[in-house]
Every structure is written in structure tokens, then in C-alpha cells.
């Protein structure tokens, strides 16, 4: 006989709620199983299976209680237990698959079938527990319920796995909530589909002898207990998750701290309060090994300074830093040490020591200091060091009333030797000279190289009354009388010395050095192996030079130079063939100053280079103007000694010729004998280069310098210029006449043209004509005149 059944809507909703809650707890349990490892993971797997299984079964049990029949419902005990076992088994399968970390499609499908079968078994075994009722199932709905069970299992396993491996985020709780609703509805759907498939009939068979569960209230109590357990588990899981996160943060911080120590490039030691090393990082172990002792010997090698610092940190409980030296069998090390107190529960526990080996940096700083204060070539103090030392000495002298003597020294002929034999020989000469100077400097003396071939000696606490400065100056001069043997060369040089004394000559270091420098130049002018004291006259002379230099600089900036031209005549052709360009300085008031008044200062200060460039450019420009007007006159220019030694001379002349498109034969270069003799190889190279350009070369002031037949033979020279001093005396001194004749004859023998300068009267002209001189120049023909007057002079010449 069929039994009519009804359903309690409240209990149905309660069962669905229990299903959703069980699903949510299952998701939590799946994460527990996944994030834990080892024994802890196994405990969560077993315990979680029981909790999850009972939760799913409770949904089924409440759903069963939602069914109302015409007769009281009683349940057999053993089928109920079997249903619980099926639910727990299915839960175990689902959690086990999730814990595998990799969920393949085959594993997902297999797990879904097993879990679905377990849930279906739980349901239908639980249905069979109803006493004195025969249940007949409609096949299609029965099959649909099993399919729903498998599909719900498939979705559940997929959701379990995805959320179990998903990293925590602010959206994770929302995902789990939605997923638990989907899973709960799926499980409930399977249950109630199975209920729809069932028709209940009274079983007329007598009741069995097995145990039955009859108490409805006891069932409600069990269900509520399970629901409470689920709720408690839910809150416990949430609290556990917060605890785990906090533990992870603490663990992460601890790992970061340990990583900071372990991977720190600086040595870190943890010291006990007694000063023993408890532990260290790898860098600390390497440092101890480099020092050559063990960690147990640390206290034996610790300096007194560090020990005091250690005690101070213990006392004040504040970090401190200091530099310290450590001396071991492996050598001396320079360390920077930071001591940091470590407190636990407001009690000093240990001391952290951060130790940096600054040995290389210390040596580098020391080397930098040496490079900044010492000369790399001679190992003597340099200019900076000398100025600093002199300043300190003068400050002390001012309070103690001592005398300080400053010697300014310059090697004579050094530039000639350096240019002729090369920088290697020049450097060695400076090194040997430095050693000789150092050997005579007394204990109260200080020596430094200022640069180039200049040195300075400073005598402190000097007794000027006993002639201490004179004695030292003479010793230095005597030392340099002995030649230097360098490589295969025997080199002779001397030294010029200038002396200034404080406080007589000043109390400022730079002022004393400047005055000693002035005195040195005065000594060099008088005799290149002398010494001179600074005096007012020397200072006044230098002041005049300084004023002249300022005038020259102002003239260069404002283009206040002009060239005047003095005609040169051919004796044979009886006509003008060229001119010599002679520079004049135009003063602000319009007066002209001849070169003799400023060329010396220009040469000494180096301004002659700029002036020489202007002369070359202006002379070439004027020669081109005359050439365009049909006046084929060569223009002779004088080259200074400093410009002759310059590497820029040849390119400058070449560029200027190209600039004005001037035929090179219209330019003549005059050089003196002395400048060509300073460096024969360089001179030959320069003169040959000029000749290759097509420029004619004249030797100016011939007969007054280092006259040598060898250089007349070797150098590409075109003309000799007899010095004016011979022409002045040619009428009154027979020897001057004979020398003049000899120069002319020698020049002709060497196929050289000869020109005489300074011809001032007809008698001199006639005498030179008789001796066969080729060209004449002097006031007899014309003074040096501006270009405009020179052109008029050309026009007035009948031969032109």
C-alpha cells in the first residue's frame, strides 16, 4: 500500500543551508590539507574527512526528517552508520585528490565518479534505513540523481582544487561563498531528486530484531550538534587562518632578518655579554680566517679601544661606531666597527658587531693623499704640500719670532737637454737632481718640487746672522758642478737660486715664494750658476716687467700693433727687391714703441706666441696686397726663439700662405744663430720644412752668436745677414772690415746670398759694394715706414 508523503519546507531550507555550510567548510578543509605537509597534512585529511562527511550526512538526515508520512518514522541503526561511512569515504576521496596539488583530467573524472557514487550510496543507504517501508524508485529520476551526484562531485572537486591552490586575496572569501552555494545546491539537488524518484509503500513484514532509532528529538539534537560543530570549526578555521598569517609574517620577518645577516657583505658577529663570539655570518668567518686566528681568540686580538667601546655599549645600551686597527701575524688591518645592543624582554641579551675591513680603502686614501701632496716623479712633496708646509711654518714663526728662509731653484739648460735627448732623459735628470738637492738639505729644511725644473727649499728656525742660507746656497751650487751620467750621456747643468727671508721680505707664503722666484730670475740674468737675495730693486724691476706684461696683454686684446717695412736693395740690380717687417706697439696716446722695449718681456711671458701669429698673418696679407698690385717684393719676418721651438709654427705658416694664396717665395723667415743651436735636430727639421714650402731662410745677426761652419753646411739656409755691429765699425776698425769681408766671401763660397743691415751712409754702402755684398738695408735708404708710405716709396724709385 502506497504511503502519501509531505515535506516540511523549513527543514528543506535548513538542509540546504547545512549543505552550503558543509561545502564552505569543505573548501576550508581543502586549503588546510593543501597548505600543510607531512603528518599535519595527514591529520587534517583524516579529521577533515570525518567533519566534512558528517556535515554532508547531516544535510541528508535533516532532508529525511523533512519527509512526513502517515506513520511514525523509525530508522535502522546499521544502515544509518553505513550511510555515514559512505559520506566520510567520499569526503576522504575529495580531500585526497585536492591534496595531490596536480589535478589531471583523468584524476578529476575518476574522483568525480568515486565521490558521486559515495554520495549516492550515502543517500540511498540512508533511505533504506527507514523501517517498515518499502521504497520503489522511478528508474529515470534514479539515474538522473546519480548523474547529478557525479556532476556535483565533478564541480566540487574542480572548485576544491582551484580554491585550494589559489593564493589568498581580498576576493577569496567571496569566491568561496559563491562556490559553497553552488556546491550545496548541487548536493541538495541530488538528494531531493532521489526523493522524487522514490515511492513509499508499507512493508507488511514483521519488524526485525535489529536496533532502531525512534526518537525524533534525538535526531534533531544530533543534527544541531553537527551543525554547531561545523559552525565552531568554521570560526576555528578562520582564527587558525589568521594565526597562520601572523605566524607567516613573523616567519617572513625572521627570514628577512636572517637573510640580512647571512647575505650581508659586511662581517657580522653576535657577541655574548662577556665578549665571546656566539655566531657570525659567512663574511665574518672569511674575515676571521683572513686575520689568521679563530673565533675563540677574538678577545685576545681586540684592541683596548674596542674593548672600551664594548663596555660603553653595554652600559648605555646604545649603538656606537669607531675605527680601529687590528694587528695580527697576517699584518695590520684597518677596521670600522659598529656595536649594536640587542635586548630581549627589556634585558640586554647580546651585542651585534658589524665589522668592515677598510684596509684597502685606507691604503687607497693614503695613496690619493700621496698623489695629491707628493710628486710622482721624484717622490718629493709637491707645490700644494710646500705651500701648506710654508703656511704652517710661518704661522708658528709669527708667534715664536723665528726666521724662515725660502730658496727658489731652477735647473739651467734643462729645456735644451729635455728637447734634445727626450723626456726619458729629462725625467731621469730631474730624479738625480732631486737626490742631490735632498742630500744637502739640513734637518731643519724641507724640499719640494714645484713642477718642471723648479724646486723649493724651506729652512725653518734659520739663523740668518751666521750665514746659514749662504752656506746652503753654495753647497747646492757646488753639488751641481759635477756632471750627471745618464744612459750614455754626460750632462752638465747648473742651478740658479733666489732667496727670500721672512719676516723681512714678507709673512705670507705665496708672497715669499713669488719674491724668491724674482730673485732666482735676477740670479739667472746675472750668471746662471749664482744665487741672489730678494731686494727692493729686484722687486721694482719685476713690477716694471709686470706692468709691461699688462700693457702687452692689453695691446694684444685691442689689436694695437702695426708693422713697418724697411726696404732691402740688390747691389747688383741697383733696385729694391724686398723689405723686412718690423713690429711697433701703438700706445694709447698714439706713440710708437720699438720692439726692443717689449719683445724681451713678450718672450719671457710667452705672449710672443700670440704676437708672432699676428706678425705672420699681417705680413702675408700685406705681401699679397703688393703682389696683386704688381710689386713682386719678398717680405722678411723675424721668428722668436719660443715660436721657433713651437710645434705649431710650420702648420701656422702653411695655413697662412693658403689663406692669402701667397706665393711662398715672397716670404722670407729670419732666425738667429743662437736659437738654431739649442736643439740641432729640431732646428734642422723646422728649417727643412720651411724650405719644402718654398720659403727662403736667413740667418739674422750673423757673426755674433754661435757661428759654426757645420750648421751652415747642414742647414738649408739661403742668406746670411751681417750684424749691424760690424757695419757700424767697418770704417774705423780694420778687424770689423776684415770680418765683414770674410763673412761675404764665406757666404759666396757656400753659395749663400749675403745682406748687410744698418747701412747709414754712402761710404759704408761703397765699401760693402766693393767687397761684393749682395743686398743692403739701413737708414741710408729708408727708415722702417708704414705700408702706405712704403708703397709711395716704391713708386718714387726710378728703377721700379
From Swiss-Prot:
Which Pfam families does the UniProt entry name for this protein?
Answer: EAL, GGDEF, MHYT
| Record's keyword annotation contains Membrane | yes
Question: Could you cite one Gene Ontology molecular function of this protein?
Answer: cyclic-guanylate-specific phosphodiesterase activity
The entry summarizes the disruption phenotype as follows: Cells do not display any phenotype.
**One annotated Gene Ontology cellular component of this protein:** plasma membrane
Keywords for this entry? Answer: Cell membrane, Membrane, Transmembrane, Transmembrane helix
Q: Which domain of life does this protein belong to?
A: Bacteria
State the NCBIfam families in the record: GGDEF (TIGR00254)
* Record protein name field: Signaling protein YkoW
Q: Which organism is it from?
A: Bacillus subtilis (strain 168)
Gene from which the chain derives:
ykoW
Amino acid at each position: 500500500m502506497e504511503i502519501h508523503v509531505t515535506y516540511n519546507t523549513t527543514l528543506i531550507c535548513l538542509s540546504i543551508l547545512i549543505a552550503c555550510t558543509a561545502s564552505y567548510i569543505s573548501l576550508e578543509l581543502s586549503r588546510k590539507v593543501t597548505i600543510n605537509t607531512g603528518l599535519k597534512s595527514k591529520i587534517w585529511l583524516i579529521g577533515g574527512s570525518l567533519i566534512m562527511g558528517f556535515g554532508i550526512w547531516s544535510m541528508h538526515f535533516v532532508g529525511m526528517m523533512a519527509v512526513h508520512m502517515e506513520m511514525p518514522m523509525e530508522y535502522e541503526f546499521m544502515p544509518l552508520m553505513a550511510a555515514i561511512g559512505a559520506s566520510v569515504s567520499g569526503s576522504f576521496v575529495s580531500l585526497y585528490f585536492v591534496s595531490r596539488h596536480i589535478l589531471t583530467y583523468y584524476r578529476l573524472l575518476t574522483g568525480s565518479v568515486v565521490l558521486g557514487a559515495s554520495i549516492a550510496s550515502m543517500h540511498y543507504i540512508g533511505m533504506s534505513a527507514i523501517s517498515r517501508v518499502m521504497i520503489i524508485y522511478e528508474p529515470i529520476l534514479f539515474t538522473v540523481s546519480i548523474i547529478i551526484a557525479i556532476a556535483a562531485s565533478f564541480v566540487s572537486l574542480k572548485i576544491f582544487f582551484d580554491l585550494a591552490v589559489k593564493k589568498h586575496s581580498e576576493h577569496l572569501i567571496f569566491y568561496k561563498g559563491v562556490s559553497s552555494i553552488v556546491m550545496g545546491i548541487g548536493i541538495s539537488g541530488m538528494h531531493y531528486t532521489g526523493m522524487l524518484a522514490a515511492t513509499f509503500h508499507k512493508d507488511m513484514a514483521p519488524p526485525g530484531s535489529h536496533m532502531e532509532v525512534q526518537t525524533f528529538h534525538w535526531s534533531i539534537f544530533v543534527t544541531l550538534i553537527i551543525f554547531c560543530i561545523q559552525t565552531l570549526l568554521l570560526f576555528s578555521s578562520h582564527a587558525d587562518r589568521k594565526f597562520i598569517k601572523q605566524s607567516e609574517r613573523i616567519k617572513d620577518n625572521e627570514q628577512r632578518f636572517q637573510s640580512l645577516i647571512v647575505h650581508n657583505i659586511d662581517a657580522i658577529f653576535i657577541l655574548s655579554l662577556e665578549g665571546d663570539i656566539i655566531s657570525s655570518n659567512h663574511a665574518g668567518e672569511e674575515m676571521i680566517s683572513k686575520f689568521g686566528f679563530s673565533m675563540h681568540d677574538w678577545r685576545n686580538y681586540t684592541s683596548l679601544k674596542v674593548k672600551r667601546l664594548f663596555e660603553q655599549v653595554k652600559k648605555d645600551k646604545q649603538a656606537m661606531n669607531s675605527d680601529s686597527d687590528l694587528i695580527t701575524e697576517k699584518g695590520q688591518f684597518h677596521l670600522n666597527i659598529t656595536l649594536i645592543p640587542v635586548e630581549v624582554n627589556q634585558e640586554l641579551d647580546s651585542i651585534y658587531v658589524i665589522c668592515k675591513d677598510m684596509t684597502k680603502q685606507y691604503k687607497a686614501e693614503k695613496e690619493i693623499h700621496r698623489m695629491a701632496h707628493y710628486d710622482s716623479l721624484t717622490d718629493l712633496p709637491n707645490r700644494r704640500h710646500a705651500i701648506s708646509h710654508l703656511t704652517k711654518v710661518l704661522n708658528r714663526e709669527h708667534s715664536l719670532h723665528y726666521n724662515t728662509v725660502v730658496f727658489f731653484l731652477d735647473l739651467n739648460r734643462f729645456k735644451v737637454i729635455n728637447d734634445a735627448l727626450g723626456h726619458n732623459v729629462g725625467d731621469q735628470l730631474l730624479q738625480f737632481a732631486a737626490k742631490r738637492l735632498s742630500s744637502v738639505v739640513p734637518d731643519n729644511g724641507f724640499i719640494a718640487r714645484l713642477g718642471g725644473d723648479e724646486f723649493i727649499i724651506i729652512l725653518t728656525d734659520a739663523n740668518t746672522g751666521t750665514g746659514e742660507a749662504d752656506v746652503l746656497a753654495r753647497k747646492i751650487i757646488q753639488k751641481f758642478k759635477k756632471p750627471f751620467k745618464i744612459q750614455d750621456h754626460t750632462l752638465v747643468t747648473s742651478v740658479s737660486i733666489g732667496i727670500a727671508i721672512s719676516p723681512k721680505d714678507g709673512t705670507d707664503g705665496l708672497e715669499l715664494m713669488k719674491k724668491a722666484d724674482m730673485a732666482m730670475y735676477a740670479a739667472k740674468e746675472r750668471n746662471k750658476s749664482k744665487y741672489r737675495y730678494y731686494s727692493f730693486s729686484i722687486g721694482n724691476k719685476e713690477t716694471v716687467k709686470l706692468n709691461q706684461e699688462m700693457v702687452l696683454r692689453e695691446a694684444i686684446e685691442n689689436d694695437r700693433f702695426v708693422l713697418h717695412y724697411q726696404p732691402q736693395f740688390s747691389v747688383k740690380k741697383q733696385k729694391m727687391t724686398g723689405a723686412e717687417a718690423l713690429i711697433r706697439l701703438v700706445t694709447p696716446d698714439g706713440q710708437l714703441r720699438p720692439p726692443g722695449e717689449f719683445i724681451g718681456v713678450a718672450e719671457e711671458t710667452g705672449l710672443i706666441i700670440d704676437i708672432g701669429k699676428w706678425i705672420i698673418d699681417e705680413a702675408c696679407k700685406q705681401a699679397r696686397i703688393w703682389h696683386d698690385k704688381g710689386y713682386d717684393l719678398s717680405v722678411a719676418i723675424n721668428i722668436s726663439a719660443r715660436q721657433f721651438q713651437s710645434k705649431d709654427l710650420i702648420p701656422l705658416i702653411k695655413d697662412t700662405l693658403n689663406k692669402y694664396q701667397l706665393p711662398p717665395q715672397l716670404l722670407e723667415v729670419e732666425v738667429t744663430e743662437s736659437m738654431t743651436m739649442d736643439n740641432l735636430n729640431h732646428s734642422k727639421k723646422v728649417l727643412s720644412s720651411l724650405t719644402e714650402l718654398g720659403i727662403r731662410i736667413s740667418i739674422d745677426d750673423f757673426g755674433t752668436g754661435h757661428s759654426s761652419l757645420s750648421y751652415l753646411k747642414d742647414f738649408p739656409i739661403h742668406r746670411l745677414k751681417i750684424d749691424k755691429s760690424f757695419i757700424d765699425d767697418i770704417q774705423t776698425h780694420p778687424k770689423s772690415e776684415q770680418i765683414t769681408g770674410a763673412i761675404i766671401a764665406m757666404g759666396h763660397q757656400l753659395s749663400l746670398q749675403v745682406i748687410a743691415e744698418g747701412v747709414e751712409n754712402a761710404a759704408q754702402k761703397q765699401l760693402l759694394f766693393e767687397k761684393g755684398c749682395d743686398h743692403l738695408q739701413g737708414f741710408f735708404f729708408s727708415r722702417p715706414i708704414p705700408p702706405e708710405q712704403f708703397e709711395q716709396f716704391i713708386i718714387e724709385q726710378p728703377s721700379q
